Amino acid sequence: MVEAIVEFDYQAQHDDELTISVGEVITNIRKEDGGWWEGQINGRRGLFPDNFVREIKKDVKKDLLSNKAPEKPMHDVSSGNSLLSSETILRTNKRGERRRRRCQVAFSYLPQNDDELELKVGDIIEVVGEVEEGWWEGVLNGKTGMFPSNFIKELSGESDELGISQDEQLSKSRPEGFLPASLLPFPAHGAKGKTTFEGTILYRAAPGKTEGHRRYYSLRETTGSESDGGDSSSTKSEGANGTVATAAIQPKKVKGVGFGDIFKDKPIKLRPRSIEVENDFLPVEKTIGKKLPPATSTPDPSKTEMDSRTKTKDYCKVIFPYEAQNDDELTIKEGDIVTLINKDCIDVGWWEGELNGRRGVFPDNFVKLLPSDFDKEGNRPKKPPPPSAPVIKQGAGTTERKHEIKKIPPERPETLPNRTEEKERPEREPKLDLQKPSVPAIPPKKPRPPKTNSLNRPGVLPPRRPERPVGPLTHTRGDSSKIDLAGSTLSGILDKDLSDRSNDIDLEGFDSVISSTEKLSHPTTSRPKATGRRPPSQSLTSSSLSSPDIFDSPSPEEDKEEHISLAHRGIDVSKKTSRTVTISQVSDNKASLPPKPGTMAAASSGPASLSSVASSPMSSSLGTAGQRASSPSLFSAEGKAKTESAVSSQAAIEELKMQVRELRTIIETMKDQQKREIKQLLSELDEEKKIRLRLQMEVNDIKKALQSK
């Protein structure tokens, strides 16, 4: 027959439920799934929630029903919390009884609800049962409650057996009424401040508030439960006069139904904290028999963390300086030795390191990894002991180690500062002793390394002019066209000088051309004339040739037409040019200016133009250069005029053809649209006719109906 004691009040919500109060005993319980049990109380049978009661074992039940004792005052400990709040019962400890499972707290935890335990690192909890996945029920410092199972580490069964054997040895060597110290919540202190009782595990309270000669003999007998909300436990103790007493179970305030309402409409929120070993809760070992390694010693996590960090420490050398842009970044200078802390940062392409006692991130392509044996050199000082504080602050030792490290860096290549312009990132340089096969992608905020310009030239170079081609050369010209114009139109001998001059001008760039307001004169005016030769015509005198009407720079539209005509009709120009030019022809062509030296030299370089110039009677003798210079200029002027007229007429014809085609397209489109509209109108007209006929028929039917009546 299963019986249970009520731990929380419950008011019946339905007819088949029981109204239970704290302290009542329910009998004839039949366990059912779903969180509800069926039992009998005060002659009435019904259902009740299983997490509002605690199952009672037979031996505990007899003690509860038979023995009662007056309440004892609560004792204050250093924390001010009331301990030993319930009365205790004395029951002789069964020597062969097995201990419960025990676990040690690995992470501190603050309770979120009333039925949860507060965990501190190093506490030992006796596990009552596993209520559900992730939550266990246990006893800690006389209080029963829930705790998260992932905040503790379970002690092995070997330690439990060792604890039992030690208790047996202690009980044999001690008086009959003496209790093992492992069952006491606090140790008693003698007159000299030493503990009177020693056992498997002792917890030390604050010495200032503990009464030295007070002894708490409390035997904690925690009953097993399948529910989760149990908080009180049945305990036994022996007073000074040996009286036996039964405890009045103290109820606990509950805000909701089931598990203390810890999962009501909210996800489970657990706040893990860093492992901090508190000296006040370190267990004390008993030297009798074997020691308890898992329960009595907890390694210092900060020490192990420091050891593992120093074992895998890497170093890198700064090859490019970088100025920190954010607070979490490091300012590194060329040649610094940075201690690597983490290569797997959130931002790809960034590493975390330490320099001069400051930690931060820096771009990985600004540094070079040092070989692994760099850390093993003998001249490095020994590692200082780890500090007790969590904040690692290395003083003069760090700077001294840094200076000694910097004495032995790998040699830097001499050609590193003089980087060529094609290299934009330091990854393209061959990196030695790198563990990564490839460089990661550039992060969004990662800067580019600076460029070193070894040529001392401006950042943007002017466009370099290529060699003079055989065909027509079409490119943008600046204000220097006036300088090139006179020499090319008047003399074929000056081609070499003009080419050298144009190359010099182009190397300077278009922005460096300075316009001149002086009028140009013919270069051959001061030369002596050959005897027996026909003087040049009046239109080719120095005054006429240097007149601003001929040598004025053309407008951009005329310049564009010159390029188009000479590019497409370079061969026609040489065929259509005549050997004799009259004054009237020159005067008629004043509006059209001669071409620039680059285009004229290209147009006259063809084989046809060269043969025509060689066969002309005016250029047969090579007496002077003054008369020969006039022939190519006049030929080119006449050919240019004809070419421009032909090009303009052809352009007009093409434009007219385009307009005709556009008009045809528009007319065709209008025809199609008109046809569609006519069809649509015809269809609508047919529909209207049908509707009208239908209405007419209906009207006739109505008339006939009216007449028949």
UniProtKB/Swiss-Prot annotation:
InterPro entries: CIN85_SH3_1 (IPR035770), CIN85_SH3_2 (IPR035771), CIN85_SH3_3 (IPR035772), Endophilin_SH3RF (IPR050384), SH3-like_dom_sf (IPR036028), SH3_domain (IPR001452). Monoubiquitinated by CBL and CBLB after EGF stimulation; probably on its C-terminus. Signal peptide: none annotated. GO terms for cellular component: cell-cell junction; cytoplasm; cytoplasmic vesicle membrane; cytoskeleton; endocytic vesicle; focal adhesion; GABA-ergic synapse; glutamatergic synapse. Residues 221-239, 535-554, 600-623 have a biased composition (Low complexity). Residues 221-242, 289-309, 373-487, 511-651 are annotated as: Disordered. Residues 513-528, 579-590 have a biased composition (Polar residues). Gene3D superfamilies: SH3 Domains (2.30.30.40). The modification Phosphothreonine is found at T298. Residues 1-58, 98-157, 311-372 form the SH3 domain. It is found in: Cytoplasm; Cytoplasm, Cytoskeleton; Cytoplasmic vesicle membrane; Synapse, Synaptosome. One of its GO terms (molecular function) is ubiquitin protein ligase binding. Highly expressed in spinal cord. Keywords: Apoptosis, Cell junction, Coiled coil, Cytoplasm, Cytoplasmic vesicle, Cytoskeleton, Endocytosis, Membrane, Phosphoprotein, Repeat, SH3 domain, SH3-binding, Synapse, Synaptosome, Ubl conjugation. The keyword Phosphoprotein applies. Residues 399-434, 561-575 have a biased composition (Basic and acidic residues). The keyword Cytoplasm applies. PROSITE patterns: SH3. The modification Phosphoserine is found at S156, S159, S227, S274, S480, S553, S555, S565, S631. It comes from the Eukaryota. Adapter protein involved in regulating diverse signal transduction pathways. Involved in the regulation of endocytosis and lysosomal degradation of ligand-induced receptor tyrosine kinases, including EGFR and MET/hepatocyte growth factor receptor, through an association with CBL and endophilins. The association with CBL, and thus the receptor internalization, may be inhibited by an interaction with PDCD6IP and/or SPRY2. Involved in regulation of ligand-dependent endocytosis of the IgE receptor. Attenuates phosphatidylinositol 3-kinase activity by interaction with its regulatory subunit. Can self-associate and form homotetramers. Interacts with MAGI2, PDCD6IP, CBL, GRB2 and PI3KR3. Interacts with CD2, F-actin capping protein, EGFR, MET, BLNK, MAP3K4, SPRY2, ARHGAP17, CRK, BCAR1, SOS1, ASAP1, ARAP3, HIP1R, SYNJ2, INPP5D and STAP1. Interacts with E3 ubiquitin-protein ligases CBL and CBLB, but does not interact with CBLC. Two molecules of SH3KBP1 seem to bind through their respective SH3 1 domain to one molecule of CBLB. The interaction with CBL or CBLB and EGFR is increased upon EGF stimulation. The interaction with CBL is attenuated by PDCD6IP. This is SH3 domain-containing kinase-binding protein 1. It comes from Rattus norvegicus.
